[in-house]
Curated annotation (Swiss-Prot):
Belongs to the RNA polymerase beta' chain family. RpoC2 subfamily. InterPro entries: DNA-dir_RpoC2_beta_pp, RNA_pol_beta''_euk, RNA_pol_Rpb1_3_sf, RNA_pol_Rpb1_4, RNA_pol_Rpb1_5, Rpb1_funnel_sf. DNA-dependent RNA polymerase catalyzes the transcription of DNA into RNA using the four ribonucleoside triphosphates as substrates. Its EC number is 2.7.7.6. It comes from Nicotiana tomentosiformis (Tobacco). Keywords: Chloroplast, DNA-directed RNA polymerase, Metal-binding, Nucleotidyltransferase, Plastid, Transcription, Transferase, Zinc. Its cofactor is Zn(2+). It is found in: Plastid, Chloroplast. GO terms for cellular component: chloroplast; DNA-directed RNA polymerase complex; mitochondrion. It catalyses: RNA(n) + a ribonucleoside 5'-triphosphate = RNA(n+1) + diphosphate. This is DNA-directed RNA polymerase subunit beta''. HAMAP family: RNApol_bact_RpoC2 (MF_01324). The gene is rpoC2.
Length: 1392
């Protein structure tokens, strides 16, 4: 103390708060100066002082002390603004998901960090004695980040997988969390808790394995005499200065170090602070130091190779168990660090990049040839400079030059005006951080249903040639064209065919899919329409008036349009030459036995129609009977239309039936029950007897109706009929008795002896004379059918337009399928169709085209962009195209096909549509969609996509378009005309009409569908629409039909919206069909912004776009699925592979350490260390020839892999701020890398191939045999290394006990009990510390040591004895740098 008092005069007085780090420094200085005991004494006094002060001044903490940082509000607002812009970019498809995630995390992380930095100055200014503030920097409990969560914002959390949740917690704990934030923070907290539990066991196991590997390593010698070392150079910029100092302090030099001619340090001298500082200042040559790697022995280590003991700053003592210390020092931080869970989610590439900012305002100039455009990791455009780039900034009076280093990103364009402090470039983080990057896969899922398209070529990954994994060669968009698919496992669905229309409430099997996609503006309309248009369905006879008709169109093409019924399940079947479009009526849905009716379009087998042949027929379910009976036409004559028998395939029953054409409206059906029985069957009723309902007739038959039984025996079978009705025994006077088989109309009096009454319905009187008895009259009920024109195909196929359109006529004819009086037999339960409504094709005999006798018909499948559609096409064979010139439209002149050729030669498919009122009402009430099947290659139906109509908007209107005056008024009221939000193409809802250019009116009163405000104009019919449609095939050729025969080719419902623009103005962009347009791209000059989508229709003055969602993908991303494939919500679209920094926290770090130590593959891309090693082995052996090659190859490989392993492990720990001395890691790595694998049988047969032996042993054996042993280096994981030691007892006590012991017994292994564990197991003295001397006998040592060393050792021993009592003297003489025992200096003296 006196000395201190004396020196106090010239000491500097530090008036400064001492925090944790300052305290650490102070203590280390004290230890350096005064040694351990003295220091502990001083610290004791400091502790006492501290407690006295703390007792005097207590701190209380109240909730008012938690002051929120004032700048938080606008910081958070700013961050939200940025995320909003980012979200928009992502929505437009400018940024892909990974970039969005990265950027949003960086935005929030920066905000959170900024708040954290604000916290301290804020407290210092407003309330320096705030207890929270004092606490957070005391270094005791609580650190800045915890306080930051109390008063700043909690920031980002990670989910259970360790991925970031990109929704930050904006509140702090003082303000309180919202529900969402609370749940997210529970994720983070739970992850912390779970990780702590899980990782503790992991870390414990890691420690156990590490100790297992190195437990036998003890310091047994002072010097192994190696000449090798590892060179460390301070000049090399790779290693920061502090790491450099850490590496050197406590090591022993392997070589003298010269500064010019002067030697500033000698070999075997240990390095202290002073020496290190000298090295740094002099920037001397690379310094060669001794490490455990260079130690000559395998099973122990010498003092000089180990260096100073970290505990007391002296050279390590003999007999110290350095192996166990090393294992623990690596394993222990693992258990501690599990508690540090960092919430950065590993997105940063080793810290945020550095920025270069502009020194002043001005214009920026640089040489554009030296940079090339690229994307930053946030998806922003930038320029990458490959060499140094000089940027000049010209402000008003001065030029600034800024130098931008290579590999940086320039964020501004040439000649751009920049403001002072604006970020102009981003310097890529140093190369050193690249090592702990990790490749991570990120899947992007589709958030809507639809079809997939992509706008660029893709490569098939070679291993998935036939799969659906594609690689993107360049940055491009993937598009999901919206539409709702419907999944069903029912086979039933295969009868839905492409382009069928259906209600959104359609029944599929027993399951009901309901979609209310377009309910938005419908409610209003439902009210308006429900009063006028209620269709009464009390009679339960379905009203077919709202069916679409079959259309005949340009060049005699008949394109069928599917039929939609309000509650119909619509199925269309395509057979080889026949379409059936069935309908279900309500009646049938309840009573499912009835087969469904349908319109069948049928083509003759040879494909040729003669005149008057039947094109399509419709079996009306009302003319269908289940029971057998007789048809009567009364007195009306009929004639058979088709003379030859016509083969009908109907419901699988082939029957020859002539067709009889009806002349009248009435026909009668007399029901009877008929059973046809085999001749051998026993009948339980007599002929002419009367039975009741459900009487037993034969063993397994019961009667369905009651009545008179007639039995007729034919050749091989019995026909049994039951006639229902009344039986009269007429008197003589009754006239009726003379008739038999007569139909009596209602109203005729019927007299009889007892009573007389009027007949209400038609009846059929039949006279029956049984044998031996008087005859009687059977009065049978009759079912009357009348055929009205109201409910037949006339509504389906109005003849006007057909006739007007080029001479083709479709006549509608009703046929009765059975002759007059013919008995009709129903087979089991099938129904019998009595009347068939047919559509007869005919054409006028024109003078010019009189030669035209036959028409060819075929079903056409058109495939556009992978979708298949069916059309029925009828061509008159010799018809010239005569009408093209007549009806040309001026608007058509600009719309030729792309190559400029005239479009008249392209065969168009035109269509005309007409609607009835029920159709309108129903299309307004009900959301509908169209079935749109996607076929796979074998044309089996795979899935349906139901495209339904939603979010339609029509943009415009523009100037110079002539409108009706009515429409003009409505435009004034409402510039955006809502066309009905569930717009679809025709057939599903109202036509989309260019109201001022209608070419073809069928209707009497024109109505305006486009504006539902003008309801008074709604009459029962309305205008037919024409569209300019273009067809695109796979090669992108455009079939552009003549505008005067405008065609609808996509009768399916999409998400559409309209964009009107006037082609009179020049358009800024030329729109091609099928083109994809991103949102916010302006097409016309003053046009509104678009939604994103694909152009599916280009009109003279507007385009229709099908909504689509773009997803951006970068090169190397994997696309799942095929082009045009249906995707469902939540399906994987793309997989990105991106890099994120490894070890965001120790939870990610520990597994990395383990991976390195177990020598597993670390990242998916870079080669494993093992492979690298093999490469080295081969090359060097080839260069140097065999005997030396193996040795040197092995040595070099081992050296290289060792250093890289040490660096990798250090990186993980350093990223956590954990300092572990390199030598601990080196000891363990040395054990992993010191084995070689014998690769082939030498002549000597000393080792068997595949045996693992130590490298030194292999060298010695090679020297002894004077023959090359072939071996190669292997990297063992720590588990394998602990199972390949010299002691089988230690191996057996670790793992696989039975196997290890059995093998050892077979080989006759000997355990020399050199390690700790073997001795512990067997209860011997541990050869460490005090038990160490007993192991090494001097005699044993002398046997295997060469002569000179013996002499040297003797000399050492003598000197030690002489100098022992002078030790203290020496100690004080030596400079502060060397805390050495004299022995060492003498050794140094001897060696030099």
């Amino acid at each position: 103390m006196e000395v201190l008092m004396a020196e106090r005069a010239n000491l500097v007085f530090h008036n400064k708060a001492i925090d944790g780090t300052a305290m650490k420094r102070l203590i280390s200085r004290l230890i350096d100066h005064f040694g351990m005991a003295y220091t502990s004494h001083i610290l004791d006094q400091v502790k006492t002082l501290g407690f006295q002060q703390a007792t005097a001044t207590s701190i209380s903490l109240g909730i008012d002390d938690l002051l929120t940082i004032p700048s938080k509000g606008w910081l958070v607002q700013d961050a939200e603004q940025q995320s909003l812009i980012l979200e928009k970019h992502h929505h437009y498809g400018n940024v892909h998901a990974v970039e969005k995630l990265r950027q949003s995390i960086e935005i929030w992380y920066a905000t959170s960090e900024y708040l954290r930095q604000e916290m301290n100055p804020n407290f210092r200014m407003t309330d320096p004695f705030n207890p929270v503030h004092i606490m957070s920097f005391s270094g005791a409990r609580g650190n800045a980040s915890q306080v930051h969560q109390l008063v700043g914002m909690r920031g980002l959390m990670s989910d259970p997988q360790g991925q970031m949740i990109d929704l930050p917690i904006q509140s702090n704990l003082r303000e309180g969390l919202s529900l969402t934030e609370y749940i997210i923070s529970c994720y983070g907290a739970r992850k912390g808790v779970v990780d702590t539990a899980v990782r503790t066991s992991d870390a414990g196991y890691l420690t156990r394995r590490l100790v297992e590997v190195v437990q036998h390593i003890v310091v047994r010698r002072t010097d192994c005499g190696t000449a090798r070392g590892i060179s460390v150079s301070p000049r090399n910029g790779m290693m920061p200065e502090r790491f450099f100092i850490q590496t050197l302090i406590g090591r022993v030099l392997a070589d003298d170090i010269y500064m010019g001619p002067r030697c500033i340090a000698t070999r075997n001298q240990d390095i202290g602070i002073g020496l290190v500082n000298r090295f740094i200042t002099f920037r001397a040559q690379p310094i060669s130091i001794r490490t455990p790697f260079t130690c000559r022995s395998t099973s122990w280590i010498c003092r000089l190779c180990y260096g100073r003991s970290p505990t007391h700053g002296d050279l390590v003592e003999l007999g110290e168990a350095v192996g166990i210390i090393a294992g623990q020092s690596i394993g222990e931080p693992g258990t501690q660090l599990t508690l540090r869970t960092f919430h950065t989610g590993g997105v940063f590439t080793g810290g945020t990049a550095e920025h270069v900012r502009a020194p002043s305002n001005g214009k920026i100039k640089f040489n554009e040839d030296l940079v090339h455009p690229t994307r930053t990791r946030h998806g922003h455009p930038a320029f990458l400079c490959s060499i140094d780039l000089y940027v000049t900034i010209e402000s008003e009076d001065i030029l600034h030059n800024v130098n931008i280093p290579p590999k940086s990103l320039l964020l501004v364009q040439n000649d751009q005006y920049v403001e002072s402090e604006q970020v102009i470039a981003e310097i890529r983080a140093g190369i050193s951080t690249l090592n702990f990057k990790e490749k991570v896969r990120k899947h992007i899922y589709s958030d809507s249903d639809g079809e997939m398209h992509w706008s660029t070529d893709v490569y098939h990954a070679p291993e998935f040639t036939y799969g659906n994994v594609h690689l993107l060669p360049k940055t491009s968009h993937l598009w999901i064209l919206l539409g709702g698919p419907c999944r069903s496992s029912l086979v039933y669905l295969s009868i839905h065919k492409d382009q069928d229309q259906m209600n959104a409430h359609f029944l599929s099997g027993k399951r009901r899919y309901t979609s209310n996609l377009s309910v938005t503006n419908d409610q209003a309309r439902q009210k308006l329409f429900s009063s006028d248009f209620s269709v009464k369905k009390e009679d339960r006879i379905p009203d077919y008036s709202d069916l679409n008709r079959i259309i005949c169109a340009g060049q005699y093409n008949l394109v069928y349009s599917p039929i939609l019924h309000e509650n119909s399940d619509l199925l269309s079947k395509r057979r080889r030459n026949k379409f059936i479009i069935p309908l279900h009526s309500i009646q049938e849905l309840e009573n499912e036995l009835m087969p469904c009716s349908g319109i069948s379009i049928e083509i003759p087998v040879n494909g040729i129609f003669r005149r008057n042949s039947i094109l399509a027929y419709f079996d009306d379910p009302r003319y269908r009977r289940k029971s057998s009976g007789i048809i009567k036409y009364g007195t009306v004559e009929t004639h058979s239309v088709i003379k030859k028998e016509d083969l009908l395939e109907y419901r699988g029953v082939k029957e020859f039936s002539p067709k009889y054409q009806m002349k009248v409206d009435l026909f009668f059906f007399i029901p009877e029950e008929v059973h046809i029985l085999p001749g051998s069957s026993s009948i339980m009723v007599r002929n002419n007897s009367i039975v009741g309902v459900d009487t037993q007739i034969t063993l397994n038959l019961r009667s369905r109706v009651g009545g008179l039984v007639r039995v007729e025996r034919k050749k091989k079978q019995i026909e049994l009929k039951i006639f229902s009705g009344d039986i009269h025994f007429p008197g003589e006077t009754d006239k009726i008795s003379r008739h038999t088989g007569v139909l009596i109309p209602p109203g005729t009096g019927k007299r009889n002896s007892k009573e007389s009454k009027k007949v209400k319905n038609w009846i059929y009187v039949q006279r029956i004379t049984p044998s031996k008895k008087r005859f009687f009259v059977l009065v049978r009920p009759v079912v009357t059918y009348e055929i009205t024109d109201g409910i037949n195909l006339a509504t389906l196929f109005p003849p006007d337009p057909l006739q007007e359109r080029d001479n083709v006529q479709l006549r509608i004819v009703n046929y009765i399928l059975y002759g007059n009086g013919k008995p009709i037999r129903g087979i089991s339960d099938t129904s019998i169709q009595l009347v068939r409504t047919c559509l007869v094709l005919n054409w006028n005999q024109d003078k010019k085209s009189s030669s035209c006798e036959e028409a060819r018909a075929s079903f056409v499948e058109i495939r556009t962009n992978g979708l298949i559609r069916h059309f029925l096409r009828i061509n008159l064979v010799k018809s010239p195209i005569s009408y093209i010139g007549k009806r040309n439209d001026p608007s058509g002149s600009g719309l030729l096909s792309d190559n400029g050729s005239d479009c008249t030669n392209i065969n168009p498919f035109s269509s005309i549509y007409s609607y009835s009122k029920a159709k309108i009402q129903q299309s307004l009430n009900q959301p509908q969609g169209t079935i749109h099947t996607l076929l796979n290659r074998n044309k089996e139906c795979q899935s349906l996509i139901i495209l339904s109509a939603a979010n339609c908007s029509r943009m415009g209107p523009f100037k110079d378009v002539k409108y009706h005056s009515v429409i003009k008024e409505s435009i004034k009221k409402d510039p955006l005309i809502p066309i009905r939000n569930s717009l679809g193409p025709l057939g599903t809802s109202l036509p989309i009409e260019n109201f001022y250019s209608s070419y073809h009116l069928i209707t009497h009163n024109q109505i305006l569908v486009t504006n539902y405000l003008q309801l008074d104009n709604l009459k029962q019919t309305f205008q037919v629409i024409k569209f300019h449609y273009y067809l695109m095939d796979e090669n992108g050729k455009i079939f552009n039909p003549d505008p005067c025969r405008n065609i609808i080719l996509n009768p399916f419902n999409l998400n559409w919206y309209f964009l009107h623009h006037n082609y009179c103005e020049e358009t800024s962009k030329i729109i091609s069909l099928g083109q994809f347009i991103c949102e916010n791209v302006c097409i016309a000059k003053n046009g509104p912004p678009l939604k994103s989508g694909q152009v599916i229709l280009v009109q003279v003055d507007s385009i229709v776009i099908r909504s689509a969602k773009p997803y951006l993908a970068t090169p190397g991303a994997t696309v799942h699925g095929h082009y045009g494939e249906t995707l469902y919500e939540g399906d994987t679209l793309v997989t990105f592979i991106y890099e994120k920094s490894r070890s965001g926290d120790i939870t990610q770090g520990l597994p990395k350490v383990e991976q390195v130590l177990e020598v597993r593959s670390i990242d998916s891309i870079s080669m494993n260390l093992e492979k690298r090693i093999e490469g080295w082995n081969k090359c060097i052996t080839r260069i140097l020839g065999i005997p030396w090659g193996f040795l040197i190859g092995a040595e070099l490989t081992i050296a290289q892999s060792r250093i890289s392993l040490v660096n990798k492990i250090q990186q993980v720990y350093r990223s956590q701020g954990v300092q572990i001395h390199n030598r601990h890691i080196e000891i363990i790595v040395r054990q992993i890398t010191s084995k070689v694998l014998v690769s082939e049988d030498g002549m000597s047969n000393v080792f068997s191939p595949g045996e693992l032996i130590g490298l030194l042993r292999a060298e010695r054996m090679g020297r002894a045999l004077e023959e090359a042993i072939c071996y190669r280096v292997v990297l063992l994981g720590i588990t394998r290394a602990s199972l390949n030691t010299q002691s089988f007892i230690s191996e057996a006590s670790f793992q696989e006990t039975a196997r290890v012991l059995a093998k050892a017994a077979l080989r006759g292994r000997i355990d020399w009990l050199k390690g700790l564990k073997e001795n512990v197991v067997l209860g011997g003295v541990i050869p460490v510390g005090t038990g160490f001397k007993g192991l090494v006998h001097p005699s044993k040592q002398h046997n295997n040591i060469p002569l000179e060393t013996k002499k040297k050792n003797l000399f050492e021993g003598e000197m030690r004895d002489i100098l022992f009592h002078h030790r203290k003297l020496f100690d004080s003489c030596l400079s502060k740098n060397f805390h050495d025992i004299p022995e060492q200096s003498f050794i140094g003296f001897n060696d030099s």
